[in-house]
Amino acid sequence: PDKCIRCLRCIEACRQVQGIGVIKLDHTGTNAAVSFGGPWGESETCIQCGQCALVCPTGALAVKDQTDRALDWFDDPAVTTVVQFAPAVRVTIGESIGARPGENLQGRIVAALRKLGADCVMDTRWSADVTIMEEGTELLERLLRQKEEGTLHGHPDTMFTSCCPGWINHIEKNCPDMIPHISSTRSPQAIFGALAKTWLPKSLGIPAERIRSISIMPCTAKKDEAARELLKHGGEPDVDLVLTVQEFAAMLDRRGIDLMSLEPAEFDSPFMSEGSGAAQLFATTGGVMEAALRTVSALAGGPDLGRIAFEPVRGLVTFKEAEVETEAFGKLRIAVVHGMRAADEVIRMVREGRSPYH
């Protein structure tokens, strides 16, 4: 609280950008201050999105740092560390080290993790492909059912993607009536974590208890996802620890590792490290939806969809839509939203029976 300068950016991000409003002001006028009296993350409406910490200029709000724990595991010979990192990380890490915008640093990240002490370094794109096959198949089944029922066009049974943990928290806490519209597929992080604790130990010939599964993600909310009870087996989490890109950059700095001076290295296991172009789309806003739609078209025997042209809805950059012509289902309408406030607009459409999106 002593670091708070009353800029109110956190309140603005929570209330205006996300539409949640869990952060409050204490008092009024010159005595106004952000309330630090209650545990926001434990409130009934906080979605653990991390946007408040993102905009805080002084560090009064900060992400829970887990770098010490990760470094301890890297240094422990009795522990086998398995690290995955998301497609976006290979580009976003460059912002912290002065690399060219958009430069792909995948190989150097792998080399840096080995230098830190990671035993296995693998690619989240592999589990992203698993997610897409599951989610694409689920969407295909929904479309086939609606086609048979004659409800495919007009106001279809809209399906939402399920990879964003902040979005899932928002649905569960604030819009539980929308749960039937959410894909049942786990996120790539969760799928990878489950396999890292089950299949991988057998493949490596070591006890599962030795594995510590670490992921590097571009989103703070992934920390909350890893702690979900539904993503544990025998009381132990599938993903033991999540580092943000900022935490990873801080670890490199602490150990004196210059990312740009390293020779690029390859991932450890091709079985859990090869990904398709569909998986690469996960790094972009709306990429999961686009990958699922392209998978549906392929599974239904249709041609490549080509470039999908999105148009802003009512001029909003946070809400865009597109019509896609498919061989099996005719025209399908899709939407991409950025931020919970924009997502709430689609939720209202679904509730009122006027959503045109599939």
Locate each region found by the language model.
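Short charge-dense sequence patches
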Residues: D2-L8, V22-K24, L54-D65, E141-R145
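Iron-sulfur-associated redox domains of electron-transfer enzymes in respiratory
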Residues: A62-H358
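Short N-terminal signal/transit or membrane-insertion segments
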Residues: E12-V17, K24, C56, V89, ...
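Non-heme iron-sulfur electron-transfer modules
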Residues: Q16-T45, G59-T81
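Cysteine-centered iron-sulfur cluster-binding motifs in ferredoxin-type domains/subunits
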Residues: P1-V17, G38-G59
